[in-house]
């Protein structure tokens, strides 16, 4: 028997929605707005901290929390830029990526290549540069960081990256050191510590949890089976939609703010491929 007109029409509408949803946005304004919000928040927090004359426990905590909140946005922005989803031009994506990885003290061109290798070899103990995140407790991450970061850079170096990427990252690192020095001189060491350095550490730890450990731990290095999707609504604002990370590994150029809609549209396909989805109920 043929499909009914209603079913045919519904199928066509779904196909049209999918084409629009998975198309490049041209200019991804939600990500640009996130970048503006991040920079505005970080600058305001540091200016606020610069005016502090007496550092009580509450004031220290206040600036750590505000700084961590805004630095949590950094990953999403440079990650989108690394995948080329913010602009069509690669150079424009790289400028935005470098500008938004910089306050998190992340060498953008190194991490861009690292991330592409991660996608190529997800959960491979030898070739995934991010596998070290999964090799111990999330609580021990700060102690494992130097060794893990060194291993990741070694894998990136073996990929044959050009000298200009290395030199640009070194230049950006020098700018970080200059900014730290200026911050200490113009404000105070405590302002730099509580409004920038500690928030950077906490934001990196949070990213490791929801981008590496939560989606990838104890999963095989197999397409469709290597990354989880969590559909709980409360995780969406906390992770900036990266609770749908399994969706990203299948369609890496899908913008972050489209993940929930894309999941609803593609859930049957994802389940048919055995993608780990939590919770299992379709009411989620």
In which residue ranges do the predicted regions lie?
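Juxtamembrane helix-capping/reentrant segments at transmembrane boundaries
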Residues: 24, 86-106, 126-136, 222-235
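Alpha-helical hydrophobic/aromatic positions enriched in membrane-embedded helices and signal peptides
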Residues: 30, 64, 71-72, 208, ...
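Histidine-centered catalytic micro-motifs
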Residues: 74-84, 111-123, 211-220, 238-256
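Juxtamembrane/interfacial segments around transmembrane helices
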Residues: 87-94, 115-120, 144-154, 219-230, ...
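Generic recognition of well-ordered alpha-helical segments
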Residues: 98, 209, 237, 261-265
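Alpha-helical transmembrane anchor segments
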Residues: 199-238
């Amino acid at each position: 028997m043929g499909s009914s007109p209603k079913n045919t029409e519904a199928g066509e509408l779904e196909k049209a929605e999918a084409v629009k949803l998975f198309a490049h946005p041209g200019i991804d304004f939600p990500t640009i707005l996130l970048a503006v919000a991040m920079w505005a928040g970080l600058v305001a927090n540091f200016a606020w901290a610069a005016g502090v004359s007496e550092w009580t426990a509450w004031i220290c905590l206040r600036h750590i929390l505000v700084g961590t909140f805004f630095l949590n946005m950094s990953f999403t922005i440079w990650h989108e830029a690394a995948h080329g989803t913010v602009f069509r031009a690669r150079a424009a994506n790289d400028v935005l990526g470098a500008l938004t990885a910089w306050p998190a003290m992340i060498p953008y061109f190194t991490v861009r290549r690292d991330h592409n290798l991660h996608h190529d070899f997800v959960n491979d103990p030898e070739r995934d540069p991010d596998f070290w995140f999964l090799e111990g407790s999330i609580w021990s991450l700060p102690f494992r960081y130097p060794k893990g970061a060194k291993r990741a850079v070694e894998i990136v170096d073996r990929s044959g990256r050009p000298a200009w990427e290395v030199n640009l990252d070194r230049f950006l690192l020098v700018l970080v050191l200059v900014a730290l020095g200026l911050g200490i001189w113009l404000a105070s060491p405590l302002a730099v510590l509580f409004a920038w350095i500690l928030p950077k550490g906490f934001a990196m730890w949070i990213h490791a949890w929801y981008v590496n450990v939560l989606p990838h731990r104890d999963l095989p290095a197999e397409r469709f089976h290597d990354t989880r999707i969590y559909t709980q609504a409360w995780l969406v604002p906390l992770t900036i939609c990266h609770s749908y990370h399994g969706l990203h590994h299948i369609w890496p150029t899908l913008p972050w703010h489209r993940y929930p809609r894309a999941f609803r549209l593609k859930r049957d396909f994802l389940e048919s491929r055995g993608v780990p989805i939590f919770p299992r109920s379709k009411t989620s």
